Amino acid sequence: MDEEEVEVVESPSEVLQPEVTVVVTGEPPEAAEEDLDYEEEEETSPEVIETLSLLDVLRVSAVMEDVIDQLSILGYIIPVQYERRQSLTQKASHEGASMITTTPKKSTSLLTKEKSMMAENKQRGQDFTFKKPTKQTMMTLETLKKIQNDRQYFSDVIANAMMEMQDSGSFTSLLKALGKERDSKMNFHDVITREEKGRKQIKTLQKQLLDVKRERQMQVQNGNEYIAHLRDQLQEMKAKTNLENLYMKRNAELQISQTQKKCNRAEELLLEEIEKLRMKTEEENRVHTEIEMFLKKQQQKLEEKLEFWMEKFDKDTEAKQNELNALKAAKASDLVHLQDLAKMIREYEQVIIEDRIEKEKTRKKLEQDDLELRSIVKLQAWWRGSVVRKEIGNFKMPKKDKDDSKDSKGKEKEKRRKK
């Protein structure tokens, strides 16, 4: 069922690419999530929407009706009580009839096709509910309620957008609903990032406190070492200054003689350079005129190529924009599919945990029953022995045995006395 919904969402983007022109400016949701570390977020620019033509409105409304039908089928597929299923089927039939009456501009052929498709989809949904696998019947009532609420909310948003599109040719209600969902998600991410920042800041402050203590100790030690080092440097500097003074005097004399020789040589080279430059300027003037003529011809050719490439650029940008819109729609549908799979996995994990808990309870109960049975057997054996020993009830020992036992007891007493 999820794959069918993805195909339905992707189909209108391919049909409406060349005709629907919608411009939405502002920061996308991914960029907003990446900028959560900043304290202030940039304000998004307002959305600009152009009204759609009548043909586009009919196409988009047909697609939205198909989506609403798919959502109603999803409601029939979800395992609920039989009474609720009947009420949902009646509600879906009323919604389908109302939507058909609100679109009088459609042709009769489209209406008959949609009615037949709705009847087939309802029949498929009913058959699927009676042939559900056992895994779906294990879902809890809370998850079913959440799925039903999400499905109802999504169908209401699409229905409102379809009514608005049929009335005014725009879909601002759909954009407002998306904005609300985006704001709630952004607030949740803000709370998480603030908490993480607070924890990181506490850790950094603790580390900084330890670093400051270590730095202070190192600074005191380095200061003492630096004072001793400066004393040594002072003595070395005194000796170096005396040597440098002698060296600077000799070096100044040598530099003066060398600069005089260099100046004479440079003067000769400059005169030769002036003559060469004069020859080059004459040649460059001649080359400049030739290059100017050549560049004018090339300019004309480049202007022609520029016009050609500008037209090609406009066409390519339009094609790439259409591809980008298609990719965005595919990305949104894939994200919805992944979210559904994640929900299903969480539900299966909950079922497995409950099964393990139930098995553990049964094992403990069997052990308790076995222990009670053993204790009962021991108690019965003890009772029977005590009944026989104490002659309770019909159990009595023979008299000879009693006399013998008395004689034996008397003999034992006499032996003890003798000892």
From Swiss-Prot:
Pfam families: IQ. Its main location: cytoplasm. CDD domains: IQCG (cd23766). Keywords: Calmodulin-binding, Cell projection, Cilium, Cytoplasm, Cytoskeleton, Differentiation, Flagellum, Spermatogenesis. Expressed in the testes (at protein level). Also detected in oviduct (at protein level). Also detected in the trachea. Residues 25-45, 394-419 are annotated as: Disordered. Disruption phenotype: No obvious phenotype, except complete male sterility. Female fertility is not altered. The IQ domain mediates interaction with calmodulin when cellular Ca(2+) levels are low. This is Dynein regulatory complex protein 9. It comes from Mus musculus.
